[in-house]
Design a protein with these regions (language model features):
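N-terminal, active-site-proximal structural segment of metallo-dependent hydrolase catalytic domains
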Residues: 2-3, 16-79, 295-300
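Sec-dependent N-terminal signal peptides
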Residues: 3-13
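Beta-strand-turn-beta hairpins that frame and shape the catalytic cleft
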Residues: 20-28, 101-105, 115-131, 265, ...
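Active-site beta-strand/loop signature of hydrolases that rely on acidic residues for catalysis
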Residues: 26-33, 49-70, 128, 148-177, ...
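Active-site environment of divalent metal-dependent phosphoester hydrolases
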Residues: 35-38, 68-72, 136-138, 168-174, ...
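Stable alpha-helical elements in mature extracytoplasmic
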Residues: 45-49, 70, 74, 141-144, ...
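Structured beta-strand-rich core segments of catalytic domains in phosphoester-bond hydrolases
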Residues: 63-143
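Metal-dependent phosphoester-hydrolase catalytic domains
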Residues: 109-110, 154-155, 172-300
Length: 300
């Protein structure tokens, strides 16, 4: 018995001396949760979404539309999907936030210059820029993109991820968008005298192009077919903002992204947009998750 006890103590001591191998796999998810589950009133949708996130087990989660949330409330939810650490941009309007299995350091909160704001954090040794760009106007979005792109440049980081709801289209989706008259008509119908989502009546690619020019990599394009990349709208909008499933299908678009630095893109092994099944009922947006493997030391 004494020998067994002594052996156990020695093992415990060695575990504190032997260096732990660095984590080589990292799953990063972004999700717009649609008005913070109706400002917290839709408890069933919230409960089901939390359970789903727990099942997918991301290491880092960026959230948009945390309406009605503060850091304490976000922490309570995040602990249910296994994240001890949380940061939120603000507690009014439409906040963005970040949750993680490892400690998070806030490097900057940008609020006044942007429509919804941007949260710039570091976790897992990676710089995260959580964004939610203006839904109203292509010129406002381009202005925001230039501000955020400058922040990324100033960070001088070679390991960064820009992620969230960009409310903007990618030039890599142009082949699909150019013939989508239903979506174009919807944008034209929603225009006002002050704001325009189309640029001279056409889809605008300048916002996402601004980030690509940093350079950053749109990692979804390497893993997801053009026809399967839509992140909005889901069927949950039928009866309110969409009349039928046919209208949902006709107005599909990709406006949520995970963009990474070139060196991080080298370690990206998969991207999934969860635009089928249970996620039809959680939010008007679909979540996106990128998987990274850093086994190659030169990309760590």
């Amino acid at each position: 018995m004494y020998i067994i006890l002594l052996f156990s103590i020695l093992l415990m001591g060695l575990s504190n001396v032997i260096p732990q191998a660095p984590q080589t796999n990292l799953n990063v998810m972004s999700y717009n949760i649609w008005n913070g589950f109706d400002w917290g009133k839709d408890s069933l949708r919230r409960k089901n979404c939390i359970r789903w996130i727990k099942d997918k087990n991301p290491d880092v989660l960026a959230l948009q539309e945390l309406t009605g949330y503060n850091e304490e409330k976000l922490k309570a939810d995040a602990e249910k999907w296994g994240h001890r650490y949380v940061k939120i941009l603000k507690t009014n309007g439409y906040p963005v936030g970040l949750t993680s299995k490892k400690p998070i350091t806030v490097k900057e909160r940008v609020i006044d210059e942007l429509w919804h704001g941007m949260l710039y954090c570091e976790t897992y040794g990676i710089d995260f820029f959580v964004v939610h760009l203006s839904p109203a106007d292509c010129n406002l979005r381009l202005k925001e993109a230039n501000i955020i792109a400058q922040k990324v440049k100033e960070s001088k980081s070679d390991k960064f991820i820009i992620l969230g709801d960009f409310n903007a289209h990618s030039p890599f989706d142009e082949a699909l968008l150019k013939d989508n008259q239903s979506l174009k008509k919807k944008y034209l119908k929603n225009k006002s005298e002050k704001y325009f989502n189309l640029r001279l009546g056409e889809f605008d690619y300048s916002v996402v192009s601004t980030f690509i020019a940093l350079p950053s990599i749109d990692v979804s394009t390497n893993f997801i077919d053009l026809n399967e990349r839509h992140t909005y709208p889901s069927s949950v909008l039928i009866g309110s903002y969409r009349k039928s499933f046919d209208e949902v299908k006709q107005t599909r678009e990709r406006i949520d992204y995970i963009l990474t630095s070139p060196i991080m893109a080298k370690s990206c092994v998969n991207v999934t947009i969860y635009n089928k099944g249970a996620t039809e009922t959680f939010s008007d947006h679909y979540p996106i998750m990128a998987e990274f493997n850093f086994k190659d030391e030169k990309y760590r």
